[in-house]
Amino acid sequence: MPDRIVALGASNLVRGLPTLVAAARAASGPTVEVLAALGHGRSYGGRSVFLARALPGILECGLWRELERLPAAPTRALITDVGNDILYGFSASRTLAWVEDAADRLRRVTDDIVLTDLPLASIRRLSSARFLLFRSILVPRCRLSLAQIAETASQVNEGLAALAAARGLRLLHLKEHWYGVDPIHIRPSLWRCAWCEILGGGTGDIAPGDNSWLEGLRLYLLPAERQRHFGLERMTPQSGVALKAGGRIRLF
């Protein structure tokens, strides 16, 4: 396994970060570095807001400057959670252009890149009532219909497959059974299975006590490099937080 993991994503990555860190540490040892650009509702190309917190688009964050600054190291990159921009009303072509930009930037530091698609089967099995419920909770400003979202998601999935083939990325199809009542967030009981598969490691590699709730809480509370709270910008330099069980983490 590589010495450095670079992960891009949104809510699923926020929820699965403790598992991802534990799996990376189990596979690569206690010196592994994890750099993650993530956040609830995170957009690849636009500013995103969750409650009172605002984050720049992944393409606009400080991760890319940090990758240029750090010395070269064997790296695996993960591009995940690419569907939020559909819910924000961006077209399939715009969404794919942002993902392509991210992939091309990552290819400057590694050719080991995993790209996940969208859980289209989970979306398609939604009833109209459930769709309206989740839309009102997750993206209350969205006015797209279920049919429109499913059609755009299908176009994005086709584009992701073409991008993976053209750029030599490893495309990972998200499993339908990873999702339950919530159509876009992986079930908590399957975080370990899902994120180990996305990372490319075995689920049995994580020691029983390695993915502790204390570390998970600490990771959840760590601030990203640049964010706004109630309109006030907050900058937190990311020199790398050392974790007690091993590994260093930088968040953007």
Where on the chain are the PLM-derived regions?
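Alpha-helical cap/lid subdomain in secreted, periplasmic
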Residues: E60-S189, C193-E197, G201-I206, N211, ...
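Conserved SGNH/GDSL esterase-like catalytic core that processes O-acyl groups on lipids
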Residues: P2-A97, A242
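N-terminal secretory targeting modules
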Residues: M1-H40, L132-P140, D205-F252
